[in-house]
Amino acid sequence: MINFTRKPRYGYEDLLEIIRLLRSPEGCPWDRVQTHQSIRRGMLEEAYEAAEAIDTDNAALLKEELGDVLMQVVFHAGIEADAGRFDMDDVCDGVVKKLLYRHPHVFGDGQAETADTVPASWEQLKRQEKGQKTTADALDAVARSLPGLWRAEKIQKKAAEAGFDWRDVSAALDKLDEETAELRQAVRDGTNVEEELGDVLFATVKVGRFCGVDPETAVNGTCEKFIRRFRAMEEAAAAEGRSLSDMTLEEMTALWNGAKECS
């Protein structure tokens, strides 16, 4: 048994210590054997749960989920500390130096008249810092682990900053029509369907960007709408003493259309 001082309230240093103890030879056998890869999914899940707490404006839940995200950060740093490569102090040192460098208008003699001017300056300094000499370098640096729609939006935005973009939303919609026609042809031919579907999704993201709509938010909203309507359809079937599995597609479509009218 490990003795850990119990307190009415714990702080950052306590979190570092408990993670260290959990990974120690006397600690938890599960925690000791974890690797970056084995807990990678957990880190993503905690980040998404924190995002959901933000979306629902739930302060109590956000406090909990931010703690879970921080635990993941400390755990990953603990793995590296055990390997002798870096620790949490190195992580904090790096991010503080980054913030100092990318805020010359606060910690130096740079100028930023409005909040709108800051992102462009941040991006320019980021590219200098990472040695991205061309726009292609910046595009290639967009994380491949991002959700596809999110990655597409970031890539398009960086390309647009270099002047490569459609004139307006009408031109973007025309491109979407073109890509949709190519997808239809690919489906008929039975070839290149994945590539053409990707082109349609990429073009759809472009339309959303012109309209100021976040594609991930949009598709998640549609998912929620689908769930609501499906639930209404299922409840309508149950009210008739029936199950969806016993109904024809035409019968389910009629219930679906009724659910659409009510939502």
Short names for language-model regions:
Residues 1-65, 71-197, 201-263:
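Flexible "arm" and connector segments at domain edges
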